[in-house]
Amino acid sequence: MNEQQRLASQQVNSSTKKEEKDYSKYFESVYQPPSLKDAKKRGKEEVKIERDFGLPEEFRNFGTGRKFYIRTYGCQMNEHDTEVMAGIFTALGYEPTFSTEDADVVLLNTCAIRENAENKVFGELGHLKSLKRRNSDLLIGVCGCMSQEESVVNKIMQKNQHVDMVFGTHNIHRLPYILKDAMFSKETVVEVWSKEGDVIENLPKVRRGDIKAWVNIMYGCDKFCTYCIVPYTRGKERSRRPEDIIQEIRHLAANGYKEITLLGQNVNAYGKDFEDIEYGLGDLMDELRKVDIARIRFTTSHPRDFDDHLIEVLGKGGNLVEHIHLPVQSGSTEMLKIMARKYSREHYLELVRKIKEAIPNAVLTTDIIVGFPNETDEQFEETMSLYREVGFDTAFTFIYSPREGTPAAKMKDNVPMEVKKERLQRLNALVNKLAIEKNDRYKGQIVEVLVDGESKNNPEVLAGYTRTNKLVNFVAPKSLIGQLVKIKVTDAKTWSLNGELVEEPIEVE
């Protein structure tokens, strides 16, 4: 199963032509390239918590009569950032549109995790160039993780001068000011902060639905895996205060939301940066068990920080679901060491044993990289054997993609691309084989499903997910959308289940 890019829409307006200039001055003042050495000097600058977000009077009705469109690439964190930007646009008076043709402002919220994602963004910028020619007042912006990479911003400035604004991951709350500057500037507005970022509370949000919601519990990552750009693009680990998180989730529950996914680049490190209290993800999850909401999930986990207390709390069940996404990346201890994952094959397998002991019906999924520099046949076979031993339900699988500025990008690699592709094919065959075997076991079982809406493939069919994150398709009245129902599984496919309704909506206790 390969990564699927999620696309979200929404969006806004105006700008002027630009001259060719030396843009190096922007990087001298507000931008630094990714640097492992500099990034590891973290902790000297205090992380501020801002609770007073508000729009100054000058921005009242700033966007009245204008429309905005946001295209989102990448992870759930980006999706949630898009919800925040949509909230700011709406507060400014803008209206969303689902067409770039109708938009006054187009933002591309980007992902830097793999080269393929970057290529898609530059391809889209090429398409937007003709739109800009037809509408010189259109504002085009690039934000998100790609904007935190100096080489990417240089490329935008040199080859995509129709872009009006570039901003990063740490200053979304400054979107009104960036829009205003871009609207009246003759040059591309570049505002990319090299500081590690603060925690900004009370930002407006326009959520994509009223059934499920993302809730950030922390930002950034300090793990510095050798292949990963995220610690540079998202900054150091910084946690939201538990009272702010719990208040937000209680508010969502009161407004009828049924499922919450707690977000962080490394959620298991939650609370490790607190200096006044000893409080981690296990403590937070234990408190969230008491909130009147049907389901609580979290992503993404790092095996290194997955502690016994969290496992104990998850074993209590209730509204804490039995699905855990636990990226392993490789089954070879030697490869894991080169990746700087800071755990071994044996440590990972012991963690899995503890999880399954505490949560017997736990469903585990994972991420795996193949073709890391100099990966041997034997090391790849260790990944295959670990996959079988754990018995994952599915996995996101990737061929290693070098990211400029990371240590792995400098490693010599003697593995031909043909070999990497062959390994990926073999791994995917195993993933598919185990996926259908796991799903077959659901036949005849009755499962709880949260109904998301109509199936993408058939509007006459409803679709939803189990507590273990299995997609289920079934025929039922559309009035059940947003409800928890009981479904008897009648058929299993590789990536989904089919079933029939056996019970009306379930009351959430």
From Swiss-Prot:
Where located? Cytoplasm
- Ranges where the Radical SAM core domain occurs: 207-437
The UniProt annotation places [4Fe-4S] cluster 1 binding at C75, C111, C145
A GO term from the CC aspect: cytosol
Specify the superkingdom.
Bacteria
Write out the GO MF terms. Answer: 4 iron, 4 sulfur cluster binding; metal ion binding; N6-isopentenyladenosine methylthiotransferase activity
- Subunit note: Monomer.
Q: Please give the name of this protein.
A: tRNA-2-methylthio-N(6)-dimethylallyladenosine synthase
Its ancestry begins with: Bacteria, Bacillati, Bacillota, Bacilli, Bacillales
Q: Which gene encodes it?
A: miaB
